[in-house]
Structures are given as structure tokens and as C-alpha cells.
Amino acid sequence: MMKQTIAVICGGRSGEHEVSLTSAQSIVDALDRFRFNVLTIGIDRHGAWWLGSNVIDNLRKGQQPYGQRVYFIPDPTCPGLIEENPVTRKPVPVDVFFPVLHGPNGEDGTIQGLFEAANVPYVGCGVLASACGMDKAIMKALFAQSDLPQLPYLVVLRNRWESAREQVIDEVEDRLGYPCFVKPANMGSSVGISKATNRAELVAAFDDAVRYDRKLIVEKGINVREIEVSVLGNDEVVASVPGEIVPAHEFYDYDAKYAAADSRLLIPAPIAAADVATFQEMAIRAFRAIDGSGLSRVDFLLDKNSGEVYINEINTLPGFTSISMYPKLWEATGIPYGELLSRLVDLGLARYREKQRNATERLPRL
């Protein structure tokens, strides 16, 4: 069988640039070399695309040139990558693109739209699901429409915070109380999230979060366990065994995810068998609520006092580092890391083939 060429894309103009590089390195190392030729494309913090086997390491070190400069051409008649060469403009053939771009410009539908314009296969959720999964305000509205239980929350725009902060504080205290969490609506990996237990901490939390986004989410805080479920599929969807995060810090913030060695992942989560099915069913409903495809990780909050389950959020491009929950949950469910990557590629190709069935011009009635 002829090998397929997979282009893993990482880095990007995002606060999660470093996380993306770490995830991508794990994927590049684990892709099946008997089936795939693997290319690595790094996007620097200015948005330039670089191709090379050492591009991840070069981006980490700031060692320029990072690799061979390339451009992506969103033209369905000659789609894909072109090397920067004013004479030859040599194309770089790619069968499937594997975006590993966490955060804005990567998992928000931006690069997915580029792939769609070029009509090329890619791994993961499409434009709509990616955009809805990135914007927590839209995500929560879709969850509400699907009758998925959520904790009380508010959406606050940056300009409202800057022009009427006293009113915002009063509204948060009246409707949510303390503790509460403030987070950017369009960031992942817990970047910019803070817990507030009083007014001074609330002000500091808002001032930090507005550095990352114009739209903020404020959620009521309760005493919870953090449960996560991995989802895999297109129209036919399966869910993994649930896992539990026991954070080293008070909550699972950026440092707890990527720096603290004493955060623990309990896989499978120590929950009742009946609750396992509940989490899995809700995870699949959340995935379908955003019209997901390929993969997602769905995060839940389990109230330690009442036992109530609340959906927290869906992550359409979860971390793939060696300590990331998404691949670990599938390993515990019976799908090893390398096989998981192959399945994701197959799902991306299947969705592409399904899309090619759609007419691009008006057809006569049957």
C-alpha cells in the first residue's frame, strides 16, 4: 500500500503556542511510519509557515531560519503547500493535514476554513464545530438548547468591564456570588482563568482575563470533582471511559496542566458504573450539539455534595502531550496512541469523501 503523506501543523499565533509544539511532537513521534510519511510544519508567532524535521525544536529555541519557508495555497485546482522559491515554486504534496494548533487561529475554525477553501482533507472538527467549541458563550448556548445541565454563568464583554466595572461586579455578586471563576471565552488550556473568592480577587481576575479576549465567562464555583470523557467519530460516535483530574493546585489551571508534576489523572475515574454511562451519553450529546467530527474531549463537573453532574465545556482539539487526558482515556478504553492517530486520519478522510458527495451546482430534480 502506498504511504500517505501527513502534514502535522503546530505553533501558531496563540497563547498556547508552546502547548501546541509539545502536542505536535508527541503526534509526530507516534504516527505509524509504515503507513505515513510525516511532514512537520511550524507556524511562528508572526504567522509564517516553516517546513522541516527540526522545526519544532527550532521554534522552541528561537533558532532561525526555523526551516524551509512554505505557503499554503487555498485554491482547489492546485491546493496545498508551495515552497518559497521565486523560480520553481515547487509544490509539497500532502494527502491529509493534521492541525495541532491549540487556541485562537487553530481550533476556532480559522485554519479549518482555510482547508475547506482549498478542498483538502484534514483531521478533526470542521469550521462550525471548531468555532462553537472555541467560543464558550456560543458553546454554552448550544448546550442549553440540548438540555445539558450547566452551572449558572454570565457573559461579560471587555468594553462593558472597562466602562462599568462596578455594575459588573454587582451583577456577579448578586447572580453568582463567591467563589466564582472568570475565564476568557476563546482560550483553552486554562489560560487566563482565575478563581475569585472576594471582590478584590474578582477585579484582578477580570483584569487578567481581558488581556486574552473581548468576551469573558463568569461561572459559579462549587465544590466539584473534575471528570473528562474522550469522544471519537463522525456520524457514528463512541465515548471513552471517564477519567478524573486531581489537580495539584486548587483547580486545574495552566500550571497544573503543564508544569506541576503532582497533578494526578485517575483513569478510569472512581465513579459508580451507572454514572459511567451518564457521562458517556452526555459527552456524545455535547459532541453532536456542536456538530463535531473526528475528536473532542468533554469536561464535566461532579458536585461533591449533591452528586449532580454538570457539563463544563467541550474541547475540539484537546492536548496530545504525554500527560494529556484525551489519548490516555483511549488507551484505557483499548485504543493505543498510535492506533488512535491512525483512526483520526481515517475519520478525516471519511469526512472529506462524504463532503465530495455534495453537489456544488444546482441539479435538476430527480
UniProtKB/Swiss-Prot annotation:
Disulfide bonds: none annotated. Pfam families: Dala_Dala_lig_C, Dala_Dala_lig_N. Mg(2+) 1 binds at D299, E313. Binds 2 magnesium or manganese ions per subunit. GO terms for biological process: cell wall organization; peptidoglycan biosynthetic process; regulation of cell shape. Pathway: Cell wall biogenesis; peptidoglycan biosynthesis. One of its GO terms (molecular function) is D-alanine-D-alanine ligase activity. GO terms for cellular component: cytosol. This is D-alanine--D-alanine ligase. It comes from Heliobacterium modesticaldum (strain ATCC 51547 / Ice1). The gene is ddl.
